[in-house]
Amino acid sequence: MRTEYCGQLRLSHVGQQVTLCGWVNRRRDLGSLIFIDMRDREGIVQVFFDPDRADALKLASELRNEFCIQVTGTVRARDEKNINRDMATGEIEVLASSLTIINRADVLPLDSNHVNTEEARLKYRYLDLRRPEMAQRLKTRAKITSLVRRFMDDHGFLDIETPMLTKATPEGARDYLVPSRVHKGKFYALPQSPQLFKQLLMMSGFDRYYQIVKCFRDEDLRADRQPEFTQIDVETSFMTAPQVREVMEALVRHLWLEVKGVDLGDFPVMTFAEAERRYGSDKPDLRNPMELTDVADLLKSVEFAVFAGPANDPKGRVAALRVPGGASLTRKQIDEYGNFVKIYGAKGLAYIKVNERAKGLEGINSPVAKFLSAEIIEAILDRTAAQDGDMIFFGADNKKIVADGMGALLLKVGKDLGLTDESKWAPLWVIDFPMFEDDGEGGLTAMHHPFTSPKDMTAAELKAAPENAVANAYDMVINGYEVGGGSVRIHNGDMQQTVFGILGINEEEQREKFGFLLDALKYGTPPHAGLAFGLDRLTMLLTGTDNIRDVIAFPKTTAAACLMTEAPSFANPTALAELSIQVVKKAENN
């Protein structure tokens, strides 16, 4: 039906007869001439109808936005004065000789001249996806997956599929369950990741595996989360953690070079402890020049409990954040930042405004200065490298509250004051995570997943001091987003059972849930390691959007609903009966 795409016509096509198929993006009726902007997935081209082709001109008068049409015509160069430098096709236009209206369009529920609500965009997603910016995002996503496949193939990886209907395993979120009609009362689980299957593939001898795969997690959503998402899943045998990172870093550098024309360079490596200390986060945004500075040792003897308490508590922390030029902040802005850190459990936000250092105490403005000696204030200013015009904020509490609150404040202030360089790309690896974290109930939970190997520890050493264990794990972070994470896996049965025991999984439960894995570990399991990238998040970064729904063709809302199809929906009673399922309604509160 077509010979060319609208958006691909150039001066090289001048004089050629072409047939185009697409949609009316806009129509301009000048009486004797009618111009339309005709659009397809590749872009927009101007088509015009003149009186010499009376039939086509007459039919063109009926055109409205989003009519689906076919046009045959001749490509012509535009006059110099009519060239549109803002359009890729702006140097040419098509003189139509024939027009076919393939399908007419009703009055549109989306308005191209206004910003539509996200609810409307999701309900009429098939119309929203016609917009050039949305089409470009999905084209970029397709390019990314193509580049990934070629790269992985070139590096000896095998694309192997793993099951969608599998067994529920604890991976940190709730599973989506699928009832079995054949096995009454039993359920499959949709995979949160192919984690165990890819490890089993390593045990099967397929030493380089990858898959671009759907995963499912029934969890509360955020702007960068979806109940179903896509991973670039990778696993290797006989490779160390640095070797895995080297290959995966090369993949990501390849993507940025091909999609953005940007060489990311070598990725710096930072330990979890350093990231938390300097940035209050295991996902630091290195585009932001600010860092946290520990000052607890300077404040242990002050007569100000807000500082002295955490400074003398082994579980406490006092951190300072120097904001260049921050002395210009108003009291209202400072109060807003104080309320902001309270979201993370902080009690407030102390500060020192540095107006003129040379004047000593008279050159600063601070509600806490009266509790501090001139020597201590000078020491704080020296340690933070404060200059005239700067602001110093303080966080004082337990380590987690300080890290969470001050880390979030660092990001917010950096964005608010334009200190974060939005034009840069700042990738890094974060390594050496704690293997376990407190579950809040006196036990431990795996910081990554229970199949991650500890670093330089035997099973006996791990059992004796699990709180000291460092995971042989690594995350890739770009501009403050975790885009991928992985680890060296446990390849020894005793170590795996030790980890299960630390996590409170008794031997009976181990056999019930992971018997197949424990059995497989008995038969010459190779050392193996892997990683998974979030394709949706990678695409989000590469297309410059801050909403992951913009890079998924048919996403869910934050309530995990599809507004277009109205999923989820009630099941047919007959289907439920066949599955031996009865829906129990919750009693309403009186």
Swiss-Prot record:
GO terms for biological process: aspartyl-tRNA aminoacylation. GO terms for molecular function: aspartate-tRNA ligase activity; ATP binding; nucleic acid binding. It is found in: Cytoplasm. L-aspartate binds at E171, R217, H448, R489. ATP binds at R217, D218, E219, Q226, E482, G534, L535, D536, R537. Homodimer. This is Aspartate--tRNA ligase. The gene is aspS.
